[in-house]
Amino acid sequence: MGIYAVTGGSHGIGAKTVELLKKEGHEVINIDLLKGDITADLTTLEGRQKVIDELHALHPEGLDGLILSAAVSGACGSLTKIISLNYFGAVSVIKGTYDLLEKKHGSCVAVSSNVISQDIARMDIADLLNNNSDDEH
């Protein structure tokens, strides 16, 4: 069976993903802010590095899969937090564990949404991040 790491594995889509993978007999490392096998705050550089370091220590032989599901919605009220977690958290973990995925020819799935456009950000900023502004101007 495979070895999978899931960010945001204690809630929502991430929790269901962990449940299904375990049911199939895979080893799953749940990465979450409070209740994970690896606990870390992916909004911070330190938290991201902790995840990368711990995954390398736990499975230097590689990962079969990485699922990036950790995210916050516009309801959190902080554009900085949304971008720090939903974008930079995911990108940093992908880049930092890419070598582990390569070792086992593993796959990476990044879960995303259009939360940035839900009344929390200026629409010109949201359009830039969504790459829509070039078509409109």
Which positions does each model-derived feature cover?
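Conserved hydrophobic beta-strands of the Rossmann-like cofactor-binding core
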Residues: 3-6, 66-67
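N-terminal Rossmann NAD(P)H-binding glycine-rich loop of SDR-like oxidoreductase domains
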Residues: 7-10, 14-19
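Rossmann-fold cofactor-recognition segment
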Residues: 33-47
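A hydrophobic alpha-helix adjacent to the NAD(P)-binding/active-site core of NAD(P)-dependent oxidoreductases
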Residues: 37, 82-83
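Conserved Rossmann-fold cofactor-binding substructure of NAD(P)-dependent oxidoreductases
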Residues: 43-61
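Hydrophobic positions on the long internal alpha-helix
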Residues: 67, 93-101
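Catalytic loop of short-chain dehydrogenase/reductase
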Residues: 72-76, 80, 104-137
